[in-house]
Amino acid sequence: MNKGEKLSLFKDYNLYCLTCEDYSLGRRNIDVVREILNAGVRIIQYREKKKTMREKYQEAKKIRELTAQYNALLIINDHLDLAKIVEADGVHIGQEDYPIEVAKEYLGDEFIIGLTTHTKTQVIEAFQKGADYIGLGPIFPSYTKEKPHPPIGLEIIEWAVNHVHIPIVAIGGIKESNIYEVLKHGAKCIAMVTEIVSSQDIYEKTKNIIRILEGYKNGKNLA
């Protein structure tokens, strides 16, 4: 896939899954990713805060091999060098990480650059500085980070969709029970962490979320 084809996945009611071993009920990231990919997910973000860089490299390399088999995208959280080394499709950076222009210069034009945003100002700045997609949240209360940002609510999704012309990935506390609220406010790409990785049956949970997204895309309410 070229970059344009890859970015089209962010605009087509797809599920964007992040790894989080702390919440995966003792299961390894690689095993969680395998189940998620088997269920049909096309976008994976490798986010791992606690392991050594060697451990992250070894794990990300295996996940890259898996995503390639499934023709899925691999986005690396934070680490530009790791993204480049394992030949990921992109990197996701936060407000306090490397500037977008630095990431672009280091990784090249074909890499996807995603940026976390919490406010309207940050959304506009991300667009103006050349982010390929925006992670917008947390929409609802979320506790996967040590210092969670307060929830920003649903209305900003609709505002962002109408004010910038790059994909918006809604993230933060999104679950099967509230996903319709997020979709109704204009989100076309939904990120989930604990709703997926903490499920007893990751495959079935993921399949059900995908079914909801596809149903919404096709104009059917399957709730």
Curated annotation (Swiss-Prot):
EC number(s) from the headed UniProt entry: 2.5.1.3
Entry binding sites for Mg(2+): D78, D97
Top EC class of this enzyme: transferase
Keywords tagged on the record: Magnesium, Metal-binding, Thiamine biosynthesis, Transferase
Biological-process GO terms, alphabetical: thiamine biosynthetic process; thiamine diphosphate biosynthetic process
GO molecular function (one): thiamine-phosphate diphosphorylase activity
Lineage: superkingdom: Bacteria
Catalytic activity from the UniProt record: 2-[(2R,5Z)-2-carboxy-4-methylthiazol-5(2H)-ylidene]ethyl phosphate + 4-amino-2-methyl-5-(diphosphooxymethyl)pyrimidine + 2 H(+) = thiamine phosphate + CO2 + diphosphate; 2-(2-carboxy-4-methylthiazol-5-yl)ethyl phosphate + 4-amino-2-methyl-5-(diphosphooxymethyl)pyrimidine + 2 H(+) = thiamine phosphate + CO2 + diphosphate; 4-methyl-5-(2-phosphooxyethyl)-thiazole + 4-amino-2-methyl-5-(diphosphooxymethyl)pyrimidine + H(+) = thiamine phosphate + diphosphate
Protein name: Thiamine-phosphate synthase
Organism: Dictyoglomus thermophilum (strain ATCC 35947 / DSM 3960 / H-6-12)
